[in-house]
């Protein structure tokens, strides 16, 4: 938006952002998004940018991995995050870190233990790594800032978050609230609604 519309001096009365996840990408086993599908452990939306998850895990330190799993994995149990991080770091040290999704999911399942098996044991780990590798929340913030720059006074910004995990609604709500408090033209309070519920359906 800022590279196309802004130089043209175009102002929009409304902008709609679809933050939903691409089902074709998730359904493609070669992209490594689903723990139950076998494929390379990649987890990138744009395979021309950054490094695959298998390479990232070989370089990240334990404390940073614990933070990523805890912050982006929608878990309030720090013990689970530490168990997974320890298992990954040990596998890296012993040169046996899996490079495929199913094998990595098995490693995560073994680390978490049976008491954590209410859902697919690797679901939240895959989600956390995906969010971090793709900088999903940073991209969301950049998109909303760019939209605000091209909107005219009193313009409306709509955001569809059908597939956005629950924790993504927090920064989204803060951005809306910040815009509402800074912009006197906002006559209505911002509303956020996630039709997808609290879980990311693409990782089930």
Predicted feature locations:
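S-adenosyl-L-methionine-dependent methyltransferase catalytic core, i.e., the SAM/SAH-binding region
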Residues: 1-204
């Amino acid at each position: 938006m800022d590279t196309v519309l802004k130089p043209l001096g175009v102002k929009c009365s409304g902008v709609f952002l679809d933050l939903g996840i691409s089902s074709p990408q998730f359904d493609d086993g070669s992209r490594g998004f689903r723990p139950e599908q076998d494929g390379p452990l990649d987890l990138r939306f744009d395979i021309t940018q950054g490094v695959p998850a298998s390479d990232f895990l070989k370089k990240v330190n334990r404390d940073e991995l614990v933070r990523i799993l805890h912050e982006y994995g929608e878990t309030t149990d720090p013990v689970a995050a530490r168990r997974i991080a320890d298992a990954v770091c040990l596998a890296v040290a012993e040169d046996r870190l899996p490079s495929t999704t199913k094998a990595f999911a098995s490693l995560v399942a073994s680390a978490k233990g049976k008491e954590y098996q209410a859902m697919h044991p690797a679901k939240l780990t895959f989600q956390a790594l995906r969010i971090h590798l793709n900088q999903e929340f940073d991209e969301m913030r950049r998109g909303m800032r760019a939209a605000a720059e091209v909107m005219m006074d009193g313009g409306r910004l709509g955001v569809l978050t059908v597939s956005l995990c629950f924790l993504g609604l927090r920064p989204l709500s803060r951005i809306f609230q910040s815009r509402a408090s800074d912009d006197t033209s906002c006559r209505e309070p911002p509303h956020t609604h996630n039709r997808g519920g609290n879980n990311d359906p693409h990782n089930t």
